[in-house]
């Protein structure tokens, strides 16, 4: 059934309640996406061995590095569509929809080509261990074949989020997630396909979710309707998406680049530490996505209220999203750290792998609330229309700082503990600078409103 896109008003009513109702399905959707990866890792670790587990895990940072630039563009689509929706600009929403879906497909095919043909070279540049690089390359090539569908899902779901719809994408992912788990078991256990099987299961399930979400846009009767016969770029919409999305994508890429450097450092400790790091980071991802739902809520709510000129709501959006994200990080991060050992045993029965994973979780999970707060502050800046500023802050505060840390402190104290400490140090410094920038932007906006009111 087609949905009336005029029902997603995020500018009035009890703001905290709306943020929570918006974020819960979003968090559940993100967790389901992580379950795709978790199913891969658990099935491989249990039924294909620690070498195959390391092969799948060693790809995570590299995949994020290549994908995040274009995922940032989908955030640009979300901001532009939300602002047009808040301003009741139906033509702007329509142009954004057609442009966004086209951009998603084009970027997906580009990533598929680059990822497939450059897989081995990129893994070698990351110092991927020799005993896993063959399997890692195979997994990466198959994974990137499905990239057009992954990008199509990201852009289509971003458009639905812009009008407050986070429930229907959740249903689509639930269906795809069930398919992914079943196919993992069939391909790995029944057909003994190892990493090739889990990669194939992932791209099949992502294709299902992409087709379902895109079908929702096609069935829309309001301005969010997608006309597949008129796909193409609208210059005005494309320019706005790129203005917001490119800096956001570059910021995500900056984080991923520093993670690639850290992954290379992890690789220097051998396949056991790589496997433990892979399992731990997969578990941490559940904490992060729960927090990040409130960062995504912050950018959508801020964008709609900017479009509707409800500037009085902006501070409430920031405070509520910040509170929810920090509390979520504190509760889930602390819980994951306390239950780290039994949770890691889901991924591997090898005690040395579990011990290596715990070394990471005790540092990252207990400080993850800093990352959540940092993301919310950056999202509030983006929603207000400042896209370059949070990118520059992240470039210096995260990428540069982590690179310096790896080149100096980690070289002096060559331990995994000192390596993992680079995360919380960069989070807190970057968050403080984001907060300072947001306060300056807020003051400037208030002064401009006072001047406009006096005219």
Residue ranges: model-predicted function:
Residues 1-23, 81-146, 179-182, 190-246, ...:
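Short alpha-helical transmembrane segments in multi-pass integral membrane proteins
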Residues 10-47, 61-76, 80, 105-112, ...:
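N-terminal transmembrane alpha-helices
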Residues 21-40, 142, 176, 205-209, ...:
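Transmembrane helical elements of multi-pass membrane transporters/channels
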Residues 31, 35-54, 123-130, 186-193, ...:
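Helix-terminus/linker motif at the lipid-water interface of multi-pass membrane proteins
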Residues 38-42, 113, 121, 155-159, ...:
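Alpha-helical transmembrane segments of multipass membrane proteins
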Residues 53-113, 150-169, 263, 276-340, ...:
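Small-residue-rich hydrophobic transmembrane alpha-helices
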Residues 74, 142-161, 169-177, 198-213, ...:
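Short runs within selected transmembrane alpha-helices of multi-pass transporters and secretion channels
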């Amino acid at each position: 059934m087609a949905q009336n896109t005029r029902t997603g008003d995020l500018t009035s009513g009890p703001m905290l309640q709306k943020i929570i109702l918006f974020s819960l399905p979003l968090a559940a959707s993100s967790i389901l996406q992580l379950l795709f990866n978790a199913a891969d890792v658990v099935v491989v670790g249990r039924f294909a061995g620690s070498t195959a587990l390391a092969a799948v895990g060693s790809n995570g940072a590299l995949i994020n590095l290549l994908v995040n630039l274009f995922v940032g563009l989908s955030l640009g689509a979300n901001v532009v569509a939300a602002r047009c929706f808040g301003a009741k600009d139906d033509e702007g929403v329509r142009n954004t929809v057609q442009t966004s879906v086209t951009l998603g497909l084009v970027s997906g095919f580009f990533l598929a080509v680059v990822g497939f043909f450059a897989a081995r070279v990129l893994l070698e540049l990351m110092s991927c261990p020799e005993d896993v690089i063959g399997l890692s390359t195979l997994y990466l090539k198959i994974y990137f074949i499905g990239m057009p569908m992954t990008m199509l899902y990201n852009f289509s779901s971003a458009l639905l989020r812009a009008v407050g719809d986070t429930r229907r994408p959740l249903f689509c992912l639930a269906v795809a997630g069930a398919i992914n788990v079943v196919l993992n078991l069939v391909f790995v256990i029944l057909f003994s396909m190892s990493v090739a099987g889990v990669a194939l299961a992932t791209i099949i399930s992502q294709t299902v979710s992409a087709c379902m979400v895109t079908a929702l846009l096609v069935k829309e009767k309001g301005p969010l309707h997608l006309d597949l016969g008129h796909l193409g770029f609208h210059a005005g919409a494309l320019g706005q998406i790129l203005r917001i999305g490119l800096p956001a994508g570059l910021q995500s890429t900056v984080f991923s680049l520093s993670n690639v450097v850290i992954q290379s450092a992890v690789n220097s400790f051998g396949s056991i530490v790589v496997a433990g790091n892979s399992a731990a980071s997969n578990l941490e991802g559940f904490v992060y996505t729960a927090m990040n739902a409130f960062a995504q809520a912050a950018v959508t709510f801020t964008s709609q209220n900017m479009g509707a000129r409800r500037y009085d709501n902006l501070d409430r959006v920031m405070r509520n999203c910040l509170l929810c994200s920090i509390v979520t990080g504190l509760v889930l991060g602390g819980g994951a750290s306390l239950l780290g050992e039994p949770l890691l045993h889901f991924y591997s029965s090898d005690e040395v792998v579990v011990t290596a994973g715990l070394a990471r979780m005790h540092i990252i999970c207990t400080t993850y609330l800093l990352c959540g707060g940092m993301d919310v502050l950056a999202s509030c800046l983006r929603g207000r229309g400042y896209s370059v500023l949070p990118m520059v802050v992240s470039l210096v505060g995260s990428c540069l700082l982590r690179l310096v840390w790896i080149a100096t402190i980690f070289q002096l104290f060559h331990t995994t503990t000192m390596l993992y400490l680079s995360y919380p140090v960069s989070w807190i410094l970057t968050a403080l600078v984001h907060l300072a920038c947001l306060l300056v932007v807020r003051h400037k906006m208030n002064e401009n409103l006072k001047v406009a009111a006096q005219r």
